[in-house]
Amino acid sequence: MSFQIPRGTQDILPEQAAKWQYIEHIARELCRRYNYQEIRTPIFEHTELFLRGVGDTTDIVQKEMYTFEDRGGRSLTLRPEGTAAVVRSFVENKMYGDPNQPVKLYYMGPMFRYERPQAGRFRQFVQFGVEALGSNDPAIDAEVIALAMDIYRMLGLKKLKLVINSLGDVESRKAHRQALIDHFQPRIHEFCDDCQARLHKNPMRILDCKKDRDHELMRTAPSILDYLNEQSRTYFEKVQMYLQKLGIAFEVDSRLVRGLDYYNHTAFEIMSEAEGFGAITTLCGGGRYNGLVQEIGGPETPGIGFALSIERLLAALEAEGISLPISEGIDCYVVALGEQAKEEAVALVAALRKEGISAEKDYQDRKVKAQLKAADRLHATYVAILGEDELQKGVINVKHMATGEQQEVSLHTFISHMKHVLQ
């Protein structure tokens, strides 16, 4: 019987893993610059966390979660997103008492959603995200957006569009909610079952419907921006002002609501405008969630964050034809001829590795020509050739693979020589 990976998953082979490692390095380095610290949470959580944290009217909760019962009869769910788990940890570990507010965290790891696999979309996917908890300053909204944009820019992406919106505070959303109900109610029967169910539970989510997005009532739906009270409007204006100060271009789209129930005030998405990227252009999404900490059992605490898919990021890089500057080769391949030379090669390779030099040798008992081909396939910068004659003379031949330049080096100084030429 032959086995294949489950639908919606992928194997990340070594040549691809190098790209992932580079992206992860860039993300971590930017988090260091922005003073965000890493947090790691379990891959599965109690199902109730996502029902309360993500929202029971969302597609994620209703259609996409991988939920199971453990042997103790507890309902557990593979995490479909990262924010709810980070906030749960923030509350459980009483991080709201940290004197260094806001608490700035980032996470990276696999998420799971049962959705239709397509280009750049998988049922197991890796998210990178940040959360800033404890500040109501619109400047941190702009900082979070700037961090997301910086990740894409450092990787070379240029064809990007930032879209922002305000979902307002509780008072603003209440007024807008009633306006949406009044707008859609007379013809709600023309909409899909999901929209009909959302009309009185969370009518703003109707605006996020993919099936009915071209319906004429969608185009004429009341704009949240017309229902913002003075406090919400002022907050949104300050976010825009800070983005302008940072030199970040953006568009305001009053129909942007995001797919999770916990957002309020600022909501944003970063999209790819690269040709041939596909119908789903969103690379990153985020926003403010001032009520989520309280919903999960903590004190009233403001928060804002974003999440991006590494798979979508890789697809965007491919669409723009961007190659990442990753090192594909090893520093030195030691070619050994004869039994005594093979024994010496083991020690030489170990000594190189101890000095931080990537090194390899033959383990297949291949001839010299085959060993040289192996070194070439590994993109070795140097090849060090050691035979019986070299052993008797106490030397080793070092060849630069790109230029063909060859040099005889004393075995006693070989390691220091390699450190010098590889600087």
Curated annotation (Swiss-Prot):
Catalytic activity entry: tRNA(His) + L-histidine + ATP = L-histidyl-tRNA(His) + AMP + diphosphate + H(+)
Record keyword Electron transport present: no
Major subcellular site: cytoplasm
EC id: 6.1.1.21
InterPro entries for this protein: aa-tRNA-synth_II, aa-tRNA-synth_II/BPL/LPL, Anticodon-bd, Anticodon-bd_dom_sf, His-tRNA-ligase, HisRS-like_core, HisRS/HisZ, HisRS_anticodon
Protein's name in the database: Histidine--tRNA ligase
GO biological processes: histidyl-tRNA aminoacylation
SUBUNIT field: Homodimer.
